[in-house]
UniProtKB/Swiss-Prot annotation:
It is found in: Cell membrane. It is a multi-pass membrane protein. One of its GO terms (molecular function) is monoatomic cation transmembrane transporter activity. The gene is ybjL. Belongs to the AAE transporter (TC 2.A.81) family. YbjL subfamily. This is Putative transport protein YbjL. The chain crosses the membrane at residues 8-28, 32-52, 66-86, 94-114, 158-178, 383-403, 406-426, 447-467, 475-495, 537-557.
Length: 561
């Protein structure tokens, strides 16, 4: 039996789509030196090659893909977006504006200089900034711009072409810049990280190991009584000295949870909770007494929960003010915008931050009620909220403003982005509303992006040879300029206008470019995870600004003549 692969794929859009995705994902795993191609560029390259062979796909799949992607971007940004926008993120907001704004202006200038159309210009901006949100925003605005069909088709094809030609240029140039730009300025990143660590009491170890606390019990002997010298637990400060916390005391057969006024007596049996290295720091007088193995004394349900910061008595306060250890709880991680932060007693908490806390189940629940709520550990998505806000986003995108002879539509990209932000924000404030497991959100976002990339590549592939020959050299130059010049401008602005610490500044710059591989290089150079503070500060707002940049470049283009 003979099977005509070409006829088979052309006659089945679903089969073609998944063939493109599978081949593209395989290609995306290849590495050029230390740089991995990535899923986006892998799918785009495969779809462009198949597009040259005149394979095509239904445009509805393309539209659904970009809608799912941009909506999920909004949901991820929502919990921290408003806290960054309105409060302590002024510097981060300004850095993101400078990065995105300068790239937009440079792209517009180069597009006019080289005589490109809006499709090539917007695609070049998206690729050079390695930003799919720019591509999504520009494509959606083009489709709703009222451009005549032949010109629209050409612009959309060129949009994909510009992105494909400059994506790797943007990625590689930024990674190289992240490696060498810190060496061209007079402040060493490692020194800057240590400086901010000393000022704020930060843990600079980028590879800090996290252990679960363990519980051990001891009988109080004469040496321990002598060591306490009649002081109560508050005066002894055992936690401050060792990191262990006395959770329970058995005295005369009665089990109790001690307060700070309790004084240890001969024959007491005490249960201490702490990390393994904290137990090793205990005074020898603890271990010289007999270790006790008693079911009732050791029967403690140690849990680890993720607590979402929500309540007013926690938002805007420093970690130290929560006094977690006074409540017998241990902080393992601080996560903001899916990014792990340094554990810093002086870090100011934002609404939507996630604290991973270990301790006795009752104590962890008490802490959670004080500062927010325990994140739901469920695999069930609130599909009703997902669909409802998706509909709201589409309806917002239909809004059009008329100014004299000029009309401006919000568009699906901006509408869905705004609706996603609102869903994410409300989820951070209401524990049972709009829950989407992070794994499910990642899957929908990634799948939507891959479907979108497959669609744009198949539609643009037929004209790639002509386009590559005409603008290939120009694209190389433009891609390098748009990728690196805004980074330099952003550095100068942050270093000499905002006077930011260099470790935080370089992290914030990589966040404004939403480039995780470059961020890893900055952290390695600083030998610290402190740059993650800056990265988290700009990442959420930059995703939103980049989407708006894709819309704005299409709106501004006709006004430039």
């Amino acid at each position: 039996m003979n099977i005509n692969i070409s006829d088979l794929l052309n006659g089945n859009y679903i089969l073609l789509l998944f063939v493109v995705l599978a081949l593209g994902l395989c290609l995306g795993k290849l590495r050029l030196g230390s740089v991995q191609l990535g899923n986006s560029i892998g799918v785009l390259v495969v779809s462009l090659l198949l597009g040259q062979q005149h394979f095509s796909i239904n445009t509805d799949a393309l539209n659904l893909g970009f809608m799912l992607f941009i909506f999920c971007v909004g949901v991820e940004a929502g919990p921290n977006f408003f806290s960054i926008f309105f409060r302590d993120g002024k510097n981060y907001l300004m850095l993101a504006l400078v990065m995105v704004g300068s790239a937009l202006l440079i792209a517009l200038g180069l597009g006019k200089l080289f005589g490109w159309d809006i499709g090539l210009t917007a695609g070049m901006l998206a690729g050079s900034m390695t930003s799919t949100p720019v591509l999504v925003g520009a494509g959606d605005t083009l489709r709703h711009s009222g451009i005549a069909s032949p010109q629209l088709s050409s612009a959309l094809d060129n949009l994909s072409l510009g992105y494909a030609l400059t994506y790797l240029i943007g990625l590689v140039s930024l990674i190289v810049g992240a490696r060498y730009l810190p060496k061209l300025q007079h402040q060493d990143l490692q020194t800057s990280a240590q400086q901010i660590a000393r000022e704020r009491g930060l843990d600079t170890d980028a590879n800090r190991k996290v252990y679960l606390p363990v519980i051990r019990a001891y009988r109080v002997g004469p040496e321990l009584v002598a060591w306490t010298d009649g002081k109560n637990l508050r005066e002894l400060g055992i936690y401050r000295q060792t990191g262990c916390y006395i959770e329970r005391i058995r005295r005369n057969g009665i089990l109790a949870n001690p307060d700070g006024d309790a004084v240890l007596q001969m024959g007491d049996e005490i249960a201490l909770v702490g990390y393994p290295d904290a137990h090793a720091r205990l005074d020898p007088s603890f271990r010289n007494g007999k270790e006790v193995f008693d079911r009732d004394l050791l029967d403690m349900r140690i849990v680890t929960e993720e607590i979402v910061v929500k309540n007013h008595n926690a938002v805007g306060r420093r970690l130290a003010q929560l006094k977690l250890t006074d409540h017998g709880c241990f902080l393992n991680r601080v996560i903001r915008s899916q990014i792990e932060m340094p554990i810093d007693d002086n870090v100011v908490l934002n609404k939507g931050d996630v604290l991973q806390v270990s301790g006795d189940a009752r104590r962890v629940k008490t802490i959670a009620d004080r500062i927010g709520f325990i994140s739901i550990h469920s695999q069930v998505t609130d599909l009703l909220a997902f669909c409802a806000f998706f509909i709201i986003g589409l309806m917002i995108g239909m809004i059009t403003f008329q100014f004299s002879n000029f009309s401006f539509g919000i568009g699906n990209a901006a509408g869905l982005l705004f609706a996603g932000i609102m869903l994410g924000f409300l989820r951070a404030n209401h524990p049972t509303f709009g829950y989407i497991p992070q794994g499910a959100l990642n899957m929908v976002k990634e799948f939507g992006l891959m479907v979108f990339m497959a669609g744009v590549g198949l539609s643009a592939g037929s004209g790639i040879n002509n386009g590559l020959g005409a603008v290939g050299g120009q694209m190389l130059i433009a891609g390098l300029v748009v990728s690196l010049v805004p980074v330099v401008i952003c550095f100068l602005f942050g270093a000499y206008v905002l006077r930011m610490n260099r470790a935080l500044l370089f992290g914030a710059m990589m966040g404004a470019r939403t480039c995780a591989p470059a961020m890893e290089i900055i952290s390695d150079t600083a030998r610290s995870n402190i740059p993650a503070l800056g990265y988290a500060g700009t990442y959420a707002i930059a995703n939103v600004l980049l989407t708006l940049a894709g819309t704005l470049i299409v709106i501004i283009w006709p006004e430039l003549g």
